[in-house]
């Protein structure tokens, strides 16, 4: 069930834009074939995003080609340690001309716990999932908390939240509240210092 929620969440994060034309497709794996779609402001560039959920030795990757705003393009990549030996990672590449090149995933770093932790959570259809302790590793000294929603004709307003350890705070901007369909909106982006584990 956790993987089903995560895959659904990955598709939500990569929301479609609606006058530039870009390839538009989603798929499980490394590549996809789709169709050309006109973009609308503020989605003004074409992009390709690779997303991965890893848990222990198992991983699932998805690919998304779409219209994006330049602010999303600046993110470049992200790696979130959500706890329980699980990660959500993304590689974003935007381009002026198709096809956009890939940014490959390196192997997960063999990092050791660094003495810090963050609240960890991943939730779909909720903005307040049950938290657990995500043990930070390596250079992860920040806690990320992202809450947002995507409005669809059916089933309607899809809420989501994501919490975990990160190495640096992403430059993400909050979105204006709206009920326009097929759009992804960030309601909360918090990034704080990780919490030091109590000495035994």
Swiss-Prot record:
GO terms for molecular function: phospholipase A2 inhibitor activity. Glycans are attached at residue 176. Coiled coil: none annotated. Keywords: Disulfide bond, Glycoprotein, Phospholipase A2 inhibitor, Secreted, Signal. It is found in: Secreted. Residues 1-19 form the signal peptide. Disulfide bonds join 22-46, 25-32, 39-67, 73-94, 95-100, 118-143, 136-165, 169-191. It comes from the Eukaryota. One of its GO terms (cellular component) is extracellular region. SUPFAM superfamilies: Snake toxin-like (SSF57302). Belongs to the CNF-like-inhibitor family. Occurs as a mixture of oligomers. Tetrameric arrangement appears to be the predominant quaternary structure. PANTHER family: LY6/PLAUR DOMAIN-CONTAINING PROTEIN 8 (PTHR20914), LY6_PLAUR DOMAIN CONTAINING 9 (PTHR20914:SF30). Inhibits the enzymatic activity of phospholipase A2 (PA2). This is Phospholipase A2 inhibitor LNF1.
């Amino acid at each position: 069930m956790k993987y089903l929620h995560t895959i659904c969440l990955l598709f939500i994060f990569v929301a479609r834009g609606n006058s530039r034309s870009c390839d538009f497709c989603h798929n499980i794996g490394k590549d996809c074939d789709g169709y050309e779609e006109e973009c609308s402001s503020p989605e003004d560039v074409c992009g390709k995003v690779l997303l991965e959920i890893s848990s222990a030795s198992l991983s699932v990757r998805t690919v998304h080609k779409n219209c994006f705003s330049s602010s999303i393009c600046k993110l470049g990549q992200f790696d979130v340690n959500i706890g329980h030996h699980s990660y959500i990672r993304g590689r974003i590449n935007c381009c002026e001309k198709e096809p956009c090149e890939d940014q490959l995933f390196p192997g997960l770093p063999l990092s050791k716990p660094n003495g810090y932790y963050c609240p960890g959570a991943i939730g779909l259809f909720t903005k307040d999932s049950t938290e657990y302790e995500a043990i930070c590793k390596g250079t992860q000294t920040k806690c990320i908390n992202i809450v947002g929603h995507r409005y669809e004709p059916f089933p309607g307003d899809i809420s989501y939240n994501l919490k975990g350890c990160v190495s640096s705070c992403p430059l993400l901007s909050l979105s204006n509240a709206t009920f326009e369909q097929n759009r992804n909106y960030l309601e909360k982006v918090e990034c704080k210092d990780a919490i030091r584990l109590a000495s035994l």
